Amino acid sequence: MTQANLSETLFKPRFKHTETSTLVRRFNRGSQPPMQSALDGKNVPHWYRMINRLMWIWRGVDPREILDVQARIVMSDAERTDDDLYDTVIGYRGGNWIYEWAKQAMDWQQKACQEQDAMRSGRYWLHASTLYNIAAYPHLKGDELAEQAQALANRAYEEAAQRLPGSLREMEFAVPGGSPVTAFLHMPKGDGPFPTVLMCGGLDAMQTDYYTLYERYFAPRGIAMLTLDMPSVGFSSKWKLTQDSSLLHQHVLKALPNVPWVDHTRVAAFGFRFGANVAVRLAYLEAPRLKAVACLGPVVHALLSDPQRQSTVPEMYLDVLASRLGMHDASDEALRVELNRYSLKVQGLLGRRCPTPMLSGFWKNDPFSPEEESRLITTSSSDGKLIEIPFNPVYRNFDHALQEITDWINHRLC
C-alpha cells in the first residue's frame, strides 16, 4: 500500500473518536498557574496541550508553520469538549489538533513523493514525520487518532532514513514475559562497530523525535544513536510503565554484544526528562555495561515525591503521567502515592555511590526539575559533572548545552 493510500485509509473523516483531553479522567482538576520550561514549552491560556515551540523548532518546524496550524485550530467553530480550550475539537475534522497537524504532514509527504532529489525528498519525509508526531502529541494511551498519526510518523521516518546520510536499521529486541520492542539504530558514515548512545526520551515524545540530536551532535563525532520508545507508547505500547522503569532499555543494553554495528564496550545513555529516570537507573544496575550517563532536566525524585511541585505542573503533563502508569481514572491522591514509588531516591538508588560517570544539566527555576535534582545525580557519581543552562536566549543555550554534553560523552566513549 502506498504512503498516500495508507493516509487515506487511516484518516477517513469520523466524529465518534474520543477527544484527547477526555482520555484521562482524573478528579480534583485545579486551575493552572502560568508555567514555562525550556524542554516542555509553556501552558498557554485556552490550550489543553503545552505549546512546545523550542523543541518543535529544534526538530525543524518553521515558527510560522506552528502559528498557521494554531490559527486554523483557533478559528474552527466545530463542537469542542471544552469551549474554553481551542484544541478540544471533537472528531477528525477541521479544527481538531490531530487533523490539522496531520493535514500539514500530508502536504510535506506529498512534496516528498514528488521530489526527484533524494536528499531533499528525505528532508521532506523527515519533516512529515515530525509533524505527524506533533499531531499525536501528547501520545495518551487509547487515543486512536493519535495512534494512527504515530503509525504514519514511523512510516515517514523509515522513508526519510533511506534517503538521508548514514544508515538506519530497524531492530527488534526480545523482552522476556512480553512482546518484543522495536528500536532504531542510527549509524554515521564509516565502518563500524561504532561507539553508541542509548537514547532515553521523555514521556511525551517518540523515539523518532530525536533525529536532530543524532544528526547535529552525535554523527559528526562518529557516534551512533540507538532509540527506543518509552513503555506504553509507540513500538513499546504493549508495555506499561512500572517502577522498574528501565526494564526495556536494560534488555536492549544486555543484547548489544550481539549487534555487530555497535561497539558494546563503548556505550553511554542519555536521558531527557523522565528518560533520565531510566538512564540513571541503568547507571546503577548496569554499571559494567555503561561508560557514562548524561541527563537533561531530569525527573528522578522531586516531581515524583513532592505534592506541592506536582500541583504546579500543567494538567496535560499529569495526564501523561497517569496515562503511562495506566491510571486513567485515578484521583490526584492515588496518582501521588504511585508516583512516589518511581523516585530513585525512594527506591534506594540515588544517594548511594555510583561508579558510572554521570552528568546532569539543569535550568534554574525549572518547574519539572530543580537544581537539587541534578546535584543529587552528580554527587552520587564517583565522576559527576553539573551544568547550569541559562534560560535566555533559550535556543542558543540549548544548543551550547547539547554540544557540551556530547563532548563529555565523546570523551568517555573514545
Curated annotation (Swiss-Prot):
Its EC number is 3.1.1.1. It catalyses: a carboxylic ester + H2O = an alcohol + a carboxylate + H(+). GO terms for molecular function: carboxylesterase activity. Pfam families: FrsA-like. SUPFAM superfamilies: alpha/beta-Hydrolases. Disulfide bonds: none annotated. It is an enzyme of class 3 (hydrolase). Keywords: Hydrolase, Serine esterase. Catalyzes the hydrolysis of esters. Belongs to the FrsA family. This is Esterase FrsA. The lineage of its organism: Bacteria, Pseudomonadati, Pseudomonadota, Gammaproteobacteria, Enterobacterales.
